[in-house]
């Protein structure tokens, strides 16, 4: 999945010479937490709600008005912004984004095109939205979690068995992280299976693989192994 498919666009930006009051107004109006700071079309920094608090701006979630007399609100954004912010290209992947957010311990990134123009923003919220969609959490279904011997065809054997019981495969996620050596963990979401068939499937799978849990989102039931 590419950044351009999940980023928020267009980017809400602010001039680096604008006042803190202007930044506060934009953050509140658009319900966002960060703004790319610009000099014309050139990205020169980024300012976040945390930067504003560290810079001494009043708590703008309170009744303080951005247009009030507080002199701190008249400071230029460039005085508190983070210069040379980390960016990401629109044709990079969501995985690249998540890695940068973790490494730099930041909430989001300006998205640029090949010409260096800011065309959007991607934040942790966008990453969460991607995860919810990718693993099928936005829809009902039944999630199986299991640990499999890490060999060719191990996941196909399980999904073939699920189909034999009438299930439709929704999403599959597999990882070696936190699995025992020589194993992998698989998370498979299925749909369109009746309760008797589901019960038999769980019983058969439990005899063949190391089941971790089954969560039936349709019935609000879970079984931990």
Q: Which ranges hold each PLM region?
A:
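Short basic, glycine-rich beta-strand/loop surfaces that mediate nucleic-acid
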Residues: 183-192
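Conserved short beta-strand edge segments in small beta-sheet-based binding/regulatory domains
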Residues: 170-172, 202-222
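Short, basic/aromatic recognition patches
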Residues: 18-25, 96-98
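Short acidic-hydrophobic, aromatic-tinged amphipathic segments that line or gate anion-handling sites
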Residues: 14-15, 88-89
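Short acidic/polar active-site loop segments enriched in Thr and Asp
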Residues: 33, 107, 168
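A glycine-centered beta-loop-beta connector
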Residues: 27, 35-51, 101, 109-125
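Tandem CBS (Bateman) regulatory domains
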Residues: 1-10, 49-86, 93-102, 123-164, ...
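Short proline/glycine- and acidic-rich turn/helix-capping motifs at secondary-structure junctions
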Residues: 176-184, 215-225
């Amino acid at each position: 999945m590419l950044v351009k498919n999940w980023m928020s666009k267009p980017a809400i930006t602010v001039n680096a010479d604008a006042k803190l009051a202007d930044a506060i107004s934009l953050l509140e109006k658009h319900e966002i937490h960060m703004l790319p700071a610009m000099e014309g079309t050139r990205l020169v920094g980024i300012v976040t709600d945390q930067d504003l608090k560290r810079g001494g701006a009043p708590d703008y979630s309170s009744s303080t008005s951005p247009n009030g007399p507080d002199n701190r609100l008249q400071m230029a954004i460039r005085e508190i912004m983070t210069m040379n912010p980390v960016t990401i290209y629109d044709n990079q992947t969501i995985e690249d984004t998540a890695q940068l957010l973790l490494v730099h311990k930041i909430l989001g990134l300006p998205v640029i095109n090949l010409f260096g123009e800011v065309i959007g923003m991607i934040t942790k919220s966008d990453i969460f939205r991607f995860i919810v969609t990718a693993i099928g959490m936005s829809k009902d279904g039944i999630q199986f979690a299991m640990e499999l011997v890490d060999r060719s065809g191990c996941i196909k054997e399980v999904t073939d068995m699920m189909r034999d019981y009438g299930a439709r495969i929704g999403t599959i996620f597999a990882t070696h992280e936190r699995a025992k050596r020589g194993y992998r963990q698989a998370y498979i979401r299925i749909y369109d299976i009746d309760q008797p068939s589901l019960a038999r499937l769980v019983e058969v799978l439990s005899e063949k693989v190391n089941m971790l849990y089954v969560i039936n989102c349709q019935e609000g039931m879970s079984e931990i192994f």
